[in-house]
Amino acid sequence: MSIEIRNITKSFGSFQALKGIDLTIGSGELVALLGPSGCGKTTLLRIIAGLEAADSGQILLHGEDTTHRHVRERRVGFVFQHYALFRHMSVFENIAFGLRVRPRGQRPPEAEIRRRVQELLELVQLDWLADRHPGQLSGGQRQRIALARALAVEPKVLLLDEPFGALDAKVRKDLRRWLRRLHDGLHITSVFVTHDQEEALEVADRVVVLNAGQIEQVGSADEVYDHPATPFVCQFIGDVNLFHGRVHGGRALIGETVIELPDIAESDTEKALFFARPHEIEIGRGTGIGAVVRAIRRRGNAVRVELERKDGRGAVEAELSREAFGRHAIKHGDEVVIQPSKIRMFQP
């Protein structure tokens, strides 16, 4: 089922949570709403579900206007960050709940409910926990049960609000990969909210980056990471270094340093913002931006080097492989020069 969001606005008092959101999500697509706290991503998800009313605009599900339809009429499954499982019910009863509370004319026979619940328990690989209660489960197991409960009513759209936010890092990583595999098998249109860039880039078909109630960019993981549309996207997704400078003759001028811009067809400008990721910063002793090594931090197979520019214009972070770090023989307090091997340019 496709989702079409047309010029959705929403305010809470004087605060504008959403400012004219337009977005189309294809049938069977898995889309991440990514952004910082307060950007409007959860509000948008709740409006799609029918849990929140928009001030203006339309929500179309499979071409039908559902803007004013009750949540029960939208055939939407919702998974909350904190599971929202019924503690007094067993796992089996939690999953069956949505089917058993349907009006009598829409309620499946009990045998069909039991068959459906058993299928879902096997789907989420927790059939051996059917008689347990939520308090006896781990966080990861609870979230799988919450997902099974959402799927029990056979929704046309699955919405997930920070589904892994309450879990530790290792469980989060395992569960998001499991969710991707599950989605590939079910092909149900899914939208999930997250503030975790790595999570969005790894799981989603497309990422919608929101900021201050507006969409900054929509694209694949590669598009938003390698080709950010705005300075906000560039700074929000992944680590990045910011340099202030200007453009002249197809070159970036950062202080006294000149960097060729072969991929940027920009006219001369007196003010420009240049961004380079830590792994795009080269460290040497020739020409470049003078800097002093202030800290060295080893992170698995990589080494992060924190540097302070000698011209007083801020700090720079570089990332080297352990092999490259060993060749440079860098130590704390060394005076070096840095040179971005690749930069992205924006006009302020």
From Swiss-Prot:
Xref: Gene3D superfamilies: P-loop containing nucleotide triphosphate hydrolases
Subcellular location: Cell inner membrane
Domain ABC transporter: from-to ranges: 3-237
Membrane topology term: Peripheral membrane protein
Known EC number: 7.3.2.3
InterPro entries: AAA+_ATPase, ABC_SmlMolc_Importer, ABC_transporter-like_ATP-bd, ABC_transporter-like_CS, CysA_C, Mo/tungstate-bd_C_term_dom, P-loop_NTPase, Sulph_transpt1
Binding site for ATP: 35-42
Cellular component GO terms, alphabetical: ATP-binding cassette (ABC) transporter complex
Catalytic activity: sulfate(out) + ATP + H2O = sulfate(in) + ADP + phosphate + H(+); thiosulfate(out) + ATP + H2O = thiosulfate(in) + ADP + phosphate + H(+)
Keywords annotated in UniProt: ATP-binding, Cell inner membrane, Cell membrane, Membrane, Nucleotide-binding, Sulfate transport, Translocase, Transport
GO terms of molecular function: ABC-type sulfate transporter activity; ABC-type thiosulfate transporter activity; ATP binding; ATP hydrolysis activity
Quaternary structure (record): The complex is composed of two ATP-binding proteins (CysA), two transmembrane proteins (CysT and CysW) and a solute-binding protein (CysP).
Biological role: Part of the ABC transporter complex CysAWTP involved in sulfate/thiosulfate import. Responsible for energy coupling to the transport system.
Family membership noted in the UniProt record: Belongs to the ABC transporter superfamily. Sulfate/tungstate importer (TC 3.A.1.6) family.
NCBIfam families given in the database record: 3a0106s01 (TIGR00968)
Full protein name: Sulfate/thiosulfate import ATP-binding protein CysA
Originating species: Methylococcus capsulatus (strain ATCC 33009 / NCIMB 11132 / Bath)
Lineage: Bacteria, Pseudomonadati, Pseudomonadota, Gammaproteobacteria, Methylococcales
